[in-house]
Design a protein with these regions (language model features):
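N-terminal helix-turn-helix DNA-binding module of bacterial transcription factors
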Residues: 1-63
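N-terminal helix-turn-helix/winged-helix DNA-binding helices
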Residues: 2-7, 45-83, 92, 102, ...
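Bacterial carbohydrate/catabolite-sensing allosteric modules
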Residues: 3, 46, 87-92, 140-147, ...
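Short beta-strand segments enriched in small/hydrophobic residues
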Residues: 14, 21, 58-74, 181-195
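Short, surface-exposed alpha-helical segments at coil->helix boundaries
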Residues: 37, 79-83, 135, 199-210
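Short gly/ser/thr-rich secondary-structure transition/capping motifs
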Residues: 46-52, 106, 127-128, 258
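Central regulatory/effector-binding core of bacterial HTH transcription factors
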Residues: 87-132
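Active-site-adjacent beta->alpha loops and helix N-cap segments on the catalytic face
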Residues: 130-141
Length: 278
């Protein structure tokens, strides 16, 4: 006999037992004979029975699901972090529901609302949004929220490294290695900031770079927001007696820069240095 997906009531009737007995069998609880349990499980498979987890979650007040709203997964840093979160969640009996904002604040809002409608037990957010209105929206959801990478405000639990201090340490380390000209690569920073996107983390890196230069007495430095090949190659080949290093705010532009220099016969690290934050 062929069945379509059935309800717990239909499965109980087919097995000749109560709904409570079916519930004990499919959830592996005590108070039921092994032979009865096996019969119910066999019938459940034949009848394609699927427990209504949403109804169950409403009854117990939790879905054992965590929502993750990330920027994207093209950056290896985000991909590895999301994978680690998923593995840890599963070890604690939770599954994750993932949505990507693709650097679009509107898509981020849609994703957050989606998670709330699915009654996730909490949201791990890589925020693009910022400000009082955004914070108020999140608080009204009544869902525990942890932010990663960009900070919103102190009311939310935040997980990140001290980007500002780390970048100061980077400048100090490079100065000790003999580099005396440090060019900072920060693609599209002002465009993102003026567009209302949360740039807290990368702004802290930029501030740390500038503070590091001041501490090492290396002048005002040079910040580039466009990955212009002619300009970058020109700087790298400039014969001015300076030992140059390009500091990239993350590894993505660092990899692009290495490829660009290799194609233009610029040796790394013999001719210039490259370092990425991530």
């Amino acid at each position: 006999m062929i069945y379509i997906s059935c309800t717990i009531k239909e499965l109980a009737k087919a097995c000749g037992v109560s709904e409570g007995t079916v519930d004990r069998a499919v959830n592996n609880r005590s108070g039921i004979r092994e032979s009865t349990k096996q019969h119910i499980l066999e019938m459940a498979e034949q009848m394609d029975y699927r427990p209504n987890h949403l109804a169950k979650s409403l009854a117990i007040g939790g879905t054992k699901t965590i929502g993750i709203v990330s920027v994207d997964l093209s950056n290896n840093f985000f991909a590895l972090l999301v994978e680690s979160i998923e593995q840890t969640a599963r070890e604690h009996g939770y599954f994750v529901n993932l949505a990507l904002s693709h650097n679009d604040p509107e898509k981020e809002m849609e994703a957050i609302k989606y998670m709330a409608e699915r009654r996730v037990d909490g949201i791990i957010l890589f925020p693009l949004g910022k400000g009082v209105e955004f914070s108020s929206f999140l608080k009204k959801l009544g869902i525990p929220i942890v932010t990663i990478y960009n900070r919103i405000e102190c009311d939310f639990v935040h997980v990140d490294v001290d980007c500002r201090q780390i970048m100061r340490n980077v400048v100090s380390f490079l100065a000790q290695k003999g580099y005396n000209e440090m060019i900072y690569i920060d693609p599209h920073f002002e465009k993102m900031k003026s567009g209302g996107i949360n740039v807290f983390s990368i702004e802290q890196r930029r501030i740390g770079y500038l503070e590091g230069l001041k501490e090492e007495m290396l002048g005002d430095g040079e910040i580039l927001e466009d990955m212009d090949e002619r300009q970058l190659v020109g700087i790298a080949k400039r014969k001015d007696g300076m030992r140059k290093v390009f500091i990239c705010r993350n590894d993505t532009p660092a990899v692009r820069l290495m490829t660009m220099f290799r194609e233009n016969n610029i040796r790394v690290p013999e001719d210039v240095g490259i370092i990425g934050f991530d």
